[in-house]
């Protein structure tokens, strides 16, 4: 090793300070580049805007101005947009519309675009997309074939006992997959805990999603948790479960008491259970509307109650998931879970369980062992059984099915670093995380399981990144938002100045522990002040 370093001038003259400075400079300039690009685009668009102080009679500017000044008898939107099509696309070069709105309001001959982008394309019927496609030179279709397809669910009188009433159809995404070039978006940003996405990553995406571990250990406000409602009865006539719905509403109130700053959503398996939950919430608010502000629909992420069919596209900090189905008054449990039981129903489950950023609370009056797979062939039901077990057992289940924090070290270098930490008495994990991007070494706080420091050893993970932006900026920024603090050890520096690097490493760990403790103290003081202010407000 030392002979190799001495023979190579670049390695021999390697400097930690120089390398750290180069990385810091790149990160700063890379961010500036994006800001410059945004400014350039804004400048180009602004320069194209016409001067409304110099209008010619009959021009598109004069038509728009005249219509804007009218108090009544304005032209229909489609007619107006046709008449000022060139002007409106200069003023607003990007239109955000549904496929139906495009066909309704934009004239085919006069309103054309360089590109059309379909988002949530798995839910769009091909026939609904044709009008938009015809108006563009380029088509970009974005969607997830593992999520909700177009459905006639709300056009049918759905009966849980007749699983064929709701039919899924081919989407524009399905139509395009066979004929268009495909690119995968692998990075998953939403979940603050890998536990939230690990089940779907394994069962729907073949562990191809890149997820990011949190520095925070397991707790009640992170991950997936199970709430069993004993002796609840599924009303087969009303198709709902009142006792379970009441427990869901209890959790809504508890959430607003404990985490008023976090957004909240409730997802039910069925429309009937959704309606019952909404009814109980309404009844409680009539008795005491203490959380009126938190129910305000004008909040940035307002509270909602939705069902499997309507929740795609939404996300909240916390999701309460009501299964609803269970034993009836006679004690019988029918293995029918509405749209989940039919072909393709597993996609609805995937949507529902991936809406949360911080935690999912699964509320059910059945447990995983109650579902007998010999009585059903539905993939959705099978995965529901597994997800219930995941919620019941938490990390115990995930560690049994997915690799968490127990991979082998990347290199001898990583082992050496680990030995230094071990000899100094620190507790740590090797290869933290459960997807392709793992943190080389995560050092834990001596008094709990939270990680105080991520140690990166420029190993396989570092060198596997395809770009400098991904390797040196984006990945670390995402992890820092999840609470990580970083310390990088350059292998060349380690081998050239091992004693010095070991001392710096231990100093970095001690500093990280001290900063963690200071932050905990600051949070405690802040919460105490909040409680004091709240008490004063109540007294006033």
Residue ranges and their predicted role:
Residues 1-112:
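Conserved helicase NTPase catalytic core signature
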Residues 208-280:
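Conserved helicase/translocase motor-coupling segment
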Residues 156-183, 201, 214, 281, ...:
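Helicase C-terminal subdomain and adjacent C-terminal extension
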Residues 111-117, 314-326, 334, 361:
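A short beta-strand element within the Helicase C-terminal
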Residues 438, 442-477, 492-496:
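Short beta-strand-loop-alpha-helix junction that forms the active-site gateway
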Residues 74-205:
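ASCE P-loop NTPase helicase motor core
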Residues 182-225, 367-369, 374:
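Coupling/hinge elements of helicase-like and P-loop NTPase modules
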Residues 86-89, 291-317:
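Conserved motor-coupling elements within RecA-like helicase/translocase cores
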């Amino acid at each position: 090793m030392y002979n190799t370093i001495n023979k190579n001038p670049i390695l021999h003259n390697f400097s930690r300070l120089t390398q750290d400075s180069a990385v810091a400079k790149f990160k700063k300039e890379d961010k500036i580049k994006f800001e410059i690009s945004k400014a350039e685009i804004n400048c180009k668009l602004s320069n194209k805007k016409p001067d409304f102080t110099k209008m010619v009679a009959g021009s598109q500017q004069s038509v728009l101005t005249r219509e804007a000044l009218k108090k009544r008898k304005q032209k229909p939107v489609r007619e107006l947009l046709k008449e000022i099509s060139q002007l409106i696309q200069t003023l607003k070069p990007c239109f955000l519309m549904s496929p139906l709105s495009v066909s309704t309001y934009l004239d085919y001959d006069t309103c054309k675009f360089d590109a059309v982008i379909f988002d949530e394309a798995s839910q769009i019927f091909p026939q609904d997309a044709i009008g938009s496609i015809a108006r563009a030179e380029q088509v970009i279709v974005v969607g997830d074939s593992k999520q909700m397809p177009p459905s006639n669910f709300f056009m049918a009188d759905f009966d849980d006992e007749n699983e064929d009433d709701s039919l899924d159809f081919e989407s524009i995404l399905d139509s395009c997959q066979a004929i268009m070039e495909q690119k995968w978006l692998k990075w998953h940003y939403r979940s603050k805990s890998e536990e939230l996405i690990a089940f779907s990553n394994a069962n729907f995406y073949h562990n191809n999603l890149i997820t990011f571990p949190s520095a925070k250990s397991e707790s009640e406000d992170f991950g997936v948790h199970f709430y069993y409602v004993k002796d609840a009865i599924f009303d087969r006539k009303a198709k709902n479960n009142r006792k379970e719905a009441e427990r869901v509403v209890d959790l809504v109130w508890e959430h607003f008491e404990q985490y008023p700053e976090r957004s909240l959503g409730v997802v039910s398996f069925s429309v009937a259970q959704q309606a019952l939950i909404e009814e109980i919430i309404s009844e409680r608010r009539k008795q005491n509307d203490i959380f009126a502000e938190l129910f305000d629909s004008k909040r940035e992420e307002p509270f909602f109650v939705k069902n499997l069919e309507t929740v795609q596209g939404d996300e909240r900090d916390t999701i309460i998931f009501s299964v609803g189905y269970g034993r009836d008054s006679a004690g019988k449990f029918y293995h029918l879970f509405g749209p989940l039981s039919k072909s393709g129903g597993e996609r609805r489950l995937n949507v529902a369980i991936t809406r949360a950023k911080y935690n999912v609370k699964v509320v059910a009056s059945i447990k995983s062992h109650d579902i007998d797979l010999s009585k059903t062939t539905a993939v959705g039901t099978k995965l529901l059984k597994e997800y219930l077990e995941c919620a019941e057992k938490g990390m115990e289940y995930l560690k049994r099915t997915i690799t968490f924090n127990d991979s082998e070290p990347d290199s001898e270098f990583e082992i050496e670093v680990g030995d230094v930490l071990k000899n100094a008495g620190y507790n740590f994990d090797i290869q933290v995380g459960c997807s392709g991007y793992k943190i080389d070494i995560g050092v834990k706080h001596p008094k709990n399981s939270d990680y105080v420091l991520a140690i990166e050893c420029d190993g396989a993970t570092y060198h596997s990144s395809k770009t400098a932006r991904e390797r040196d900026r984006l990945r670390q920024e995402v992890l820092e938002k999840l609470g990580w603090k970083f310390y990088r050890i350059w292998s060349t520096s380690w081998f050239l100045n091992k004693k010095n690097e070991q001392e710096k490493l231990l100093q970095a760990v001690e500093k990280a522990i001290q900063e963690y403790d200071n932050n905990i103290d600051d949070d405690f003081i802040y919460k105490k002040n909040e409680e004091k202010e709240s008490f004063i407000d109540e007294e006033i």
